[in-house]
Amino acid sequence: MAADQGIFTNSVTLSPVEGSRTGGTLPRRAFRRSCDRCHAQKIKCTGNKEVTGRAPCQRCQQAGLRCVYSERCPKRKLRQSRAADLVSADPDPCLHMSSPPVPSQSLPLDVSESHSSNTSRQFLDPPDSYDWSWTSIGTDEAIDTDCWGLSQCDGGFSCQLEPTLPDLPSPFESTVEKAPLPPVSSDIARAASAQRELFDDLSAVSQELEEILLAVTVEWPKQEIWTRASPHSPTASRERIAQRRQNVWANWLTDLHMFSLDPIGMFFNASRRLLTVLRQQAQADCHQGTLDECLRTKNLFTAVHCYILNVRILTAISELLLSQIRRTQNSHMSPLEGSRSQSPSRDDTSSSSGHSSVDTIPFFSENLPIGELFSYVDPLTHALFSACTTLHVGVQLLRENEITLGVHSAQGIAASISMSGEPGEDIARTGATNSARCEEQPTTPAARVLFMFLSDEGAFQEAKSAGSRGRTIAALRRCYEDIFSLARKHKHGMLRDLNNIPP
């Protein structure tokens, strides 16, 4: 009896919550200190540990679930179960090499008894209709990862177990190392730099000449180019002058601004800058090399382009001057010519009824400078001599540019236009120049390029035999001769009128 009492002294009587298949007592076994539900949630169980039987914990009572305490597994069986779980969870051997030791309490238990396993499955699979008040974890594997310290990793084990590889260069982004360039002679580099600077200067001149050509062909035909379109011009009526006498100063400033927009000064300055750049290019050192030849060829074509722009601008200006001179000649008569047509004598003037030649002179502006008095009194003569001066300066600049480009004196445009002033000499000299051109051949590269241009523009042909667009040089020559012819005819009459002005 004592033996029997000793055997059952430490036996544990099952509580009603645990249940028993036999209804009697069980041999001594080791149970967990926490119920299955608290053990799965890894929280402290609040079951009553003072009594012999395990009372249901407060959480299970609040949830209305059955509180079950499972048996502990033997240590040897626990180790085997842990090893089997690790192998089945991750077959990668690298995982075991780099994994930290796992505590035995964190591993899932393998309960062999059907009663315990059934009870655990019933507990882990609650009804879907119940609303859990805490976060549930579906699987034991997710719980075990907390013991590994990997719960904060988004990528699972790979975030800690995968080795960090260095960034290798992509074969598609690999850069080929450039071989060092051979050393360049300082003289060659200096010459190339000088040619590039000349090209920049030529490009700037070319752009300015292109803008001037646009202004001459589009804007100039809309306005007077040698007089200001002001109410104080000799073509304005006396009533118009009287109406605007109050705002004379404002109109004068406006007219002066409009007059300053005429690009004749810009054109001559651009031609002078082109001449300066061409002289610098002629004085530049010449080195035998492919790069130097290419740069010089580029500068040569740019310089020829600037020269052709000069020719076209001067031709357009000459045509515009001639058309407006003829318009002024046909529509207006100068005050001196009006006084000369009356031909009054000093005696007749004194005996007349208060009328004299002064009555034909228009009212003068209060701000009229002395230098503009001639254009105010005789606009036609002023326009003729202004046109002659413009053509003279323009052709002279063309001649200087041709000489700097290496064009022979008999092969340029300036040679086809005589500056002597006699039309007969112009025609004879032009014929002699054309025959000289036919005999001589251009020698320099610039001369050969210009020879092709002049041949295409009809410089060596008559105006009738020139092509549809090859009338530039012929038009310049024709306007030059007509303007100078009108100036010669008008010059003698102007001097005679000045001598016959009554005191």
From Swiss-Prot:
Lovastatin acts as a hypolipidemic agent that works as inhibitor of (3S)-hydroxymethylglutaryl-coenzyme A (HMG-CoA) reductase (HMGR) which reduces HMG-CoA to mevalonate and is the key step in cholesterol biosynthesis. Lovastatin, simvastatin and related compounds are widely used to treat hypercholesteremia and reduce the risk of cardiovascular disease. Furthermore, statins such as lovastatin were found to be anticancer agents. InterPro entries: Carb_Metab_Trans_Reg, Zn2-C6_fun-type_DNA-bd_sf, Zn2Cys6_DnaBD. Its main location: nucleus. Residues 35-67 bind DNA. GO terms for biological process: nitrogen catabolite activation of transcription from RNA polymerase II promoter. Transmembrane segments: none annotated. Residues 89-124, 331-358 are annotated as: Disordered. Induction: Highly expressed during the first day of culture on solid medium; thereafter levels decrease but remain high. Expressed at much lower levels in liquid culture. It holds the Pfam family Zn_clus. GO terms for cellular component: nucleus. Residues 339-357 have a biased composition (Low complexity). It is found in: Nucleus. SUPFAM superfamilies: Zn2/Cys6 DNA-binding domain (SSF57701). It comes from the Eukaryota. Keywords: DNA-binding, Metal-binding, Nucleus, Transcription, Transcription regulation, Zinc. GO terms for molecular function: DNA binding; DNA-binding transcription factor activity, RNA polymerase II-specific; zinc ion binding. Disulfide bonds: none annotated. PANTHER family: GLUCOSE TRANSPORT TRANSCRIPTION REGULATOR RGT1-RELATED-RELATED (PTHR31668), TRANSCRIPTIONAL ACTIVATOR PROTEIN DAL81 (PTHR31668:SF4). Transcription factor that regulates the expression of the he gene cluster that mediates the biosynthesis of lovastatin (also known as mevinolin, mevacor or monacolin K), a hypolipidemic inhibitor of (3S)-hydroxymethylglutaryl-coenzyme A (HMG-CoA) reductase (HMGR). This is Transcriptional regulator LovE. The lineage of its organism: Eukaryota, Fungi, Dikarya, Ascomycota, Pezizomycotina.
